[in-house]
Amino acid sequence: MSTDNRTLRRKLDRELTYLEDRYLALRDLKSDGALAGQSIPTILQFDDAVESIAAAMQHLRNVIDILGKSE
């Protein structure tokens, strides 16, 4: 079972790295002014989406930690 956990953990680590890259790219878009001229609701939806990605990353980190402890 620990081999399965190890394999799953490695896959989740790769996915987490990808999510972190996308999160940073989206955050940088806003700081670079890419949303300039957009409506307030659009900007708020963008912010909500970025925060949802951050929350998903935290949940994924928690799962990875749990899998690591069960190895």
Mark where each language-model region is.
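Short, charge-rich amphipathic interface segments used for partner binding and complex assembly
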Residues: 11, 17-21, 25-70
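Disorder-to-helix initiation segments
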Residues: 1-8, 12
